[in-house]
């Protein structure tokens, strides 16, 4: 009986933790995505790809277009999240994520995942090509870690930004 109770408490804690991080990720995604319209023209991102960006976390959204990498760079620059070499600025990224409700639960993991993906593609010279690969890697790893939000979660908070 005690073992079942302990197991139940652990399951509830893990579920709350995962839901908490996915919920924070929905806020980060919704806010970050607001800069896309400003960056679309500058990056050469086709309108149809831009329209699909709100579905970034869906399984069938392919993170492959070079222009999407350029748009992500532009969007990141709007929030001053990159260093001069277009790699994430760890401190500024932590601060950005922590600025959202309950952001501290996601900050460390998100920066770690992005940094690990950046290391995998560090040899790609073209910034836009590299960033789109990093974004695809981050999406895959975030899903594996259980911190990726459901599209409905993003839609629920998008009006706040």
UniProtKB/Swiss-Prot annotation:
Gene3D superfamilies: Pheromone/general odorant binding protein domain
Keyword entries, A-Z: Disulfide bond, Olfaction, Sensory transduction, Signal, Transport
Signal peptide (UniProt feature, chain positions): 1-20
Keyword Transport: yes
InterPro entries: Odorant/phero-bd_Lep, PBP/GOBP, PBP_GOBP_sf
Pfam families, per database record: PBP_GOBP (PF01395)
Tissue: Olfactory tissue; expressed by the glia-like support cells that ensheathe the sensory neurons and line the base of the sensillum lumen.
Disulfides per UniProt: 39-74, 70-128, 117-137
Family: Belongs to the PBP/GOBP family.
Protein name, UniProt field: General odorant-binding protein 2
């Amino acid at each position: 009986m005690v073992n079942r109770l302990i197991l139940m408490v652990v399951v509830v804690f893990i579920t709350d933790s995962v839901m908490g991080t996915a919920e924070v990720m929905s806020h980060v995604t919704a806010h970050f995505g607001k800069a896309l319209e400003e960056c679309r023209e500058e990056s050469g991102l086709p309108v149809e790809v831009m329209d699909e960006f709100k579905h970034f976390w869906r399984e069938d959204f392919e993170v492959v277009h070079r222009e999407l990498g350029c748009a992500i760079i532009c969007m990141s620059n709007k929030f001053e999240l990159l260093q001069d070499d277009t790699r994430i600025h760890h401190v500024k990224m932590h601060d950005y994520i922590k600025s959202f409700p309950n952001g501290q639960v996601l900050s460390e993991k998100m920066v770690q995942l992005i940094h690990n993906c950046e290391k995998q593609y560090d040899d790609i010279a073209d910034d836009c090509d590299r960033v789109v690969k990093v974004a695809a890697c981050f999406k895959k790893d975030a899903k594996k870690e259980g911190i990726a939000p459901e599209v409905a979660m993003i839609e629920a908070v998008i009006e706040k930004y």
